Amino acid sequence: MEKTIDLYVKKEGAARENCFSTIGEAIEAMERIAPVPEEIAAELEKGRIYPSPVYEVTPFVVHIGAGEYREKLVLSRPNVTFLGEGRDKTVLVFGDGANEIEEDGEKRGTFRTATLRIDTPDFTARHLTFQNDAGYGHTVGQALALYVDGDRCYFEDCAMLGSQDTLFDAPLPLDPVKPNGKGPGEHKPRIRGRHLYRNCFLQGDVDFIFGSGTAYFEECTIFSKKPGDRSPEDRDTSVYGYVTAASTHPEFPYGYVLHKCKLTSDCPKGSVYLGRPWKEWAKTVFLECELGEHIHPQGWLDWGKTHGHFYYGEYNSYGPGASPETRADFSHQLTREEAEQYSMEKVLEGWFGE
């Protein structure tokens, strides 16, 4: 395997070789220092998945110093690690919202708002925050902090902060989001990516963890925040949000699995659902999670989708929001044997993010 190259990003600017004042400058420098071989770049462009790790591509570790980096970034090179100084110290933030008008006169749309879009396999991030501070969804529209579209993407001790649609765990659904859509993944192959989020903090409103990826959330804290100054009366409903909105592809065996996570909120009691299906075949399972009182007794909403297609399940939920006897009749309370089928090893097919 190629020798790892270290790059450094400091707010005060370059103080040593391979040191930069912005993360974007560090990303651009990678291709000058060690270009991705042309044949591999061509295969990645087609959406092919390589065995882990991608031995032929020089790995980079970007050491990002404390501070706020107001940048909007796309990473399309594999074998890259972002290493911050602490998720409360190193913050990558931008503020694009879906309702804003682009130069072409059209709204930006959901999938062009991401503060960071990861369009490559084998990405790792530790000890930093990804944020979209555009504002609440009812004013600015959807606003992604993170768009993850690649296999073997690993996040440890990171925070994802936003409002509506904080984390897009890609790929997109099979059907186009809109005719002639301009989203960056609209015309790409829908390849199943495995993503692991370990000891992370995720915050948002509406349904802020969504997409078609295969994702395992291990010991994460998930905070459903009250959606600004919009009260239930404004929407003629007592529902404040949904934690997940999976759009799992029919041929993917797993969607989202949340294991030993803690769900918290400043929303009223019983006002947030565990999930609703963005598309027909959504799959989401909660295992041994602590549920706050904000979780709706029904747990799940069908969003008008066909019962028997999507799959929602829980195993050993606890806390004031755990209420197996009142859960929606289309959801499942798993046995121990059934829950074992959702182990990290099975869901991620032997890849653990290390």
Question: How would you describe each model-predicted region?
Answer:
Residues 2-354:
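Sequence-level preference for short, compositionally simple segments enriched
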